[in-house]
């Protein structure tokens, strides 16, 4: 049997852009993607710290070093520029590996810069 487990989390990312008329997705600075081991087109769950909205979409790459977190399409209705988000990926982990599974956590500071990377 497998369990769905947290793989990675970007914590307290600040929304920098929201474009309702874009096709969809969430643009994330490539530095953050690399730090969290997240991939373009991967499904993500997002939790808006400001208003409690929870929603899912997929990742597209934003310019490396830009600090961009952009919500596009329908996701743009779930948060405003300046809102703080928790961005998570989950995956299937075999029961035999669950006790050794360690998610990667990226804590974000000002301008969506990487403040700390840790494993919990």
UniProtKB/Swiss-Prot annotation:
List the gene name.
Answer: panD
Cytoplasm among keywords: yes
**Annotated cofactor note:** Binds 1 pyruvoyl group covalently per subunit.
- Active site annotation, chain numbering: 25, 58
Example of a GO biological process term:
alanine biosynthetic process
Task: Name where it mostly resides.
Answer: cytoplasm
Q: Which UniProt keywords apply?
A: Autocatalytic cleavage, Cytoplasm, Decarboxylase, Lyase, Pantothenate biosynthesis, Pyruvate, Schiff base, Zymogen
> Can you quote a single GO CC term?
cytosol
Family that this chain belongs to: Belongs to the PanD family.
Q: What is its EC number?
A: 4.1.1.11
The GO terms describing molecular function are: aspartate 1-decarboxylase activity
User: What are the names of the required cofactors?
Assistant: pyruvate
**InterPro entries (alphabetical):** Asp_de-COase-like_dom_sf, Asp_decarbox
Give the multimer and partner information. Heterooctamer of four alpha and four beta subunits.
Q: Give the protein's recorded name.
A: Aspartate 1-decarboxylase
Positions annotated to bind substrate: 57, 73-75
| S-S bonds | none
Instruction: Give the UniProt subcellular location, in the record's own words.
Output: Cytoplasm
């Amino acid at each position: 049997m497998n369990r769905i487990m947290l793989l990675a989390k970007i914590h307290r990312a600040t929304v920098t852009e929201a474009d309702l008329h874009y096709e969809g997705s969430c643009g994330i600075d490539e530095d953050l993607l690399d730090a969290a081991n997240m991939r373009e087109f991967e499904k993500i769950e997002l939790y808006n710290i400001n208003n409690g909205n929870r929603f899912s979409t997929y990742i597209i790459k934003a310019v490396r070093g830009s600090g961009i977190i952009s919500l596009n399409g329908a996701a743009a209705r779930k948060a405003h520029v300046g809102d703080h988000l928790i961005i998570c990926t989950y995956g299937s982990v075999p029961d035999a590996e669950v006790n050794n599974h360690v998610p990667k956590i990226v804590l974000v500071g000002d301008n969506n810069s990487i403040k700390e990377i840790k494993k919990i």
